[in-house]
Amino acid sequence: MKFDKHMLRKYFIMGSQNCHRDPREILKEAASAGITAFQYREKGKNSLTGTAKVELAKDLKAICHDFQIPFIINDDVDLAKQLDADGIHIGQDDQPVEVVRKQFPNKIIGLSISTNNELNQSPLDLVDYIGVGPIFDTNTKEDAKTAVGLEWIQSLKKQHPSLPLVAIGGINTTNAQEIIQAGADGVSFISAITETDHILQAVQRL
């Protein structure tokens, strides 16, 4: 699947550990409501491992392809290869971008960036987009870093106007629009979908 920055507009991230009900049903509802990309992030307390993780990933990939949205895997290079995922998203503490790009020459690659130092040290020419944040404080990630705020999005867009950027961290239906107005190509979110009983309305407002 060829990358297009419009894929970032409503970027849903989820693993089974984020869900109070079947993640397959949540993804189906979110996909039919209009999310533009999905990242499978099976990490942290109560997350699946082994065969259970792989089987869920296969099901979620099939749902994504039914709705023609990219299926991206967080961090797990082996799983991304095994499932022939559309892309992989890596953090600063994961495998180096150069190594990942060699393994996935034609896949979508996203990179998390939280500081100017990380930005300056990253091979931006090898990634399709950057995930910037946390924009606001968040409780979803146990290892979340200090919030960077909207101003940093504006600064990044001035420095790298053609680099696709998706914001992450503390994003919900009440603040998503101001992030887009600040210059982000999209917003990514977890609990805004997994914690609501009204997925259609939430996706429309994100």
Curated annotation (Swiss-Prot):
<dbReference type="GO" id="GO:0009229">
    <property type="term" value="P:thiamine diphosphate biosynthetic process"/>
</dbReference>
<feature type="binding site">
    <location>
        <begin position="138"/>
        <end position="140"/>
    </location>
    <ligand>
        <name>2-[(2R,5Z)-2-carboxy-4-methylthiazol-5(2H)-ylidene]ethyl phosphate</name>
    </ligand>
</feature>
<feature type="binding site">
    <location>
        <position position="74"/>
    </location>
    <ligand>
        <name>4-amino-2-methyl-5-(diphosphooxymethyl)pyrimidine</name>
    </ligand>
</feature>
<dbReference type="InterPro" id="IPR013785">
    <property type="entry name" value="Aldolase_TIM"/>
</dbReference>
<feature type="binding site">
    <location>
        <position position="75"/>
    </location>
    <ligand>
        <name>Mg(2+)</name>
    </ligand>
</feature>
<dbReference type="InterPro" id="IPR036206">
    <property type="entry name" value="ThiamineP_synth_sf"/>
</dbReference>
<comment type="pathway">
    <text>Cofactor biosynthesis; thiamine diphosphate biosynthesis; thiamine phosphate from 4-amino-2-methyl-5-diphosphomethylpyrimidine and 4-methyl-5-(2-phosphoethyl)-thiazole: step 1/1.</text>
</comment>
<feature type="binding site">
    <location>
        <position position="112"/>
    </location>
    <ligand>
        <name>4-amino-2-methyl-5-(diphosphooxymethyl)pyrimidine</name>
    </ligand>
</feature>
<keyword id="KW-0460">Magnesium</keyword>
<dbReference type="InterPro" id="IPR022998">
    <property type="entry name" value="ThiamineP_synth_TenI"/>
</dbReference>
<keyword id="KW-0784">Thiamine biosynthesis</keyword>
<comment type="similarity">
    <text>Belongs to the thiamine-phosphate synthase family.</text>
</comment>
<dbReference type="GO" id="GO:0009228">
    <property type="term" value="P:thiamine biosynthetic process"/>
</dbReference>
<keyword id="KW-0808">Transferase</keyword>
<dbReference type="GO" id="GO:0000287">
    <property type="term" value="F:magnesium ion binding"/>
</dbReference>
<feature type="binding site">
    <location>
        <position position="141"/>
    </location>
    <ligand>
        <name>4-amino-2-methyl-5-(diphosphooxymethyl)pyrimidine</name>
    </ligand>
</feature>
<feature type="binding site">
    <location>
        <begin position="190"/>
        <end position="191"/>
    </location>
    <ligand>
        <name>2-[(2R,5Z)-2-carboxy-4-methylthiazol-5(2H)-ylidene]ethyl phosphate</name>
    </ligand>
</feature>
<dbReference type="InterPro" id="IPR034291">
    <property type="entry name" value="TMP_synthase"/>
</dbReference>
<feature type="binding site">
    <location>
        <position position="170"/>
    </location>
    <ligand>
        <name>2-[(2R,5Z)-2-carboxy-4-methylthiazol-5(2H)-ylidene]ethyl phosphate</name>
    </ligand>
</feature>
<keyword id="KW-0479">Metal-binding</keyword>
<comment type="function">
    <text>Condenses 4-methyl-5-(beta-hydroxyethyl)thiazole monophosphate (THZ-P) and 2-methyl-4-amino-5-hydroxymethyl pyrimidine pyrophosphate (HMP-PP) to form thiamine monophosphate (TMP).</text>
</comment>
<protein>
    <recommendedName>
        <fullName>Thiamine-phosphate synthase</fullName>
        <ecNumber>2.5.1.3</ecNumber>
    </recommendedName>
</protein>
<dbReference type="GO" id="GO:0004789">
    <property type="term" value="F:thiamine-phosphate diphosphorylase activity"/>
</dbReference>
<dbReference type="Pfam" id="PF02581">
    <property type="entry name" value="TMP-TENI"/>
</dbReference>
<feature type="binding site">
    <location>
        <begin position="39"/>
        <end position="43"/>
    </location>
    <ligand>
        <name>4-amino-2-methyl-5-(diphosphooxymethyl)pyrimidine</name>
    </ligand>
</feature>
<feature type="binding site">
    <location>
        <position position="94"/>
    </location>
    <ligand>
        <name>Mg(2+)</name>
    </ligand>
</feature>
<dbReference type="GO" id="GO:0005737">
    <property type="term" value="C:cytoplasm"/>
</dbReference>
